[in-house]
């Protein structure tokens, strides 16, 4: 069975956890096993979330980093934190978000909304 593991940096700001919980809930419509883990600061850590997926029956875990680029967290920290779990399940790490034109639309929408709140429009 396939498990989906959302991975993000972590933050002392509570909203980070709320955001990933919302993404996880939406993704449960497409994947039966979804967990999330943080690289640092917050709980659960990546390895704990991966172990939970294995306990729930995952034999393959697709790790989806909520990161924009393949920096040290992507290249070093995520694989290192999943070493133990890789003996129990196949680990597939998806690419970071990177550049995606769909995100350009979201950024444009956010900018337009900010301008409208100020009572200004760029058009």
From Swiss-Prot:
Pathway: Cofactor biosynthesis; adenosylcobalamin biosynthesis; cob(II)yrinate a,c-diamide from sirohydrochlorin (anaerobic route): step 1/10. It catalyses: Co-sirohydrochlorin + 2 H(+) = sirohydrochlorin + Co(2+). One of its GO terms (biological process) is anaerobic cobalamin biosynthetic process. GO terms for molecular function: cobalt ion binding; sirohydrochlorin cobaltochelatase activity. It holds the Pfam family CbiX. Its EC number is 4.99.1.3. Substrate binds at residues 43, 68-73. The active site is at 9 (proton acceptor). InterPro entries: CbiX-like, SiroHydchlorin_Cochelatase, Sirohydro_Cobaltochel/CbiX. Keywords: Cobalamin biosynthesis, Cobalt, Lyase, Metal-binding. Coiled coil: none annotated. Co(2+) binds at residues 9, 73. Catalyzes the insertion of Co(2+) into sirohydrochlorin as part of the anaerobic pathway to cobalamin biosynthesis. Belongs to the CbiX family. CbiXS subfamily. Homotetramer; dimer of dimers. This is Sirohydrochlorin cobaltochelatase.
């Amino acid at each position: 069975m396939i498990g989906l593991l959302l991975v993000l940096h972590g933050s002392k700001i509570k909203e980070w956890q709320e955001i990933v919980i919302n993404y996880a809930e939406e993704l449960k419509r497409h994947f039966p096993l979804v967990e999330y883990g943080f690289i640092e600061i917050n709980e659960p850590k990546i390895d704990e979330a991966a172990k939970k997926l294995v306990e729930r029956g995952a034999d393959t875990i697709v790790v989806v980093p909520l990161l924009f680029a393949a920096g040290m967290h992507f290249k070093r920290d995520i694989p290192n934190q999943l070493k133990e779990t890789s003996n129990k399940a196949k680990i597939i790490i998806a690419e970071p978000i990177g550049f995606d034109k769909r995100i350009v639309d979201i950024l444009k929408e956010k900018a337009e909304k900010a301008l409208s709140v100020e009572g200004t429009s760029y058009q």
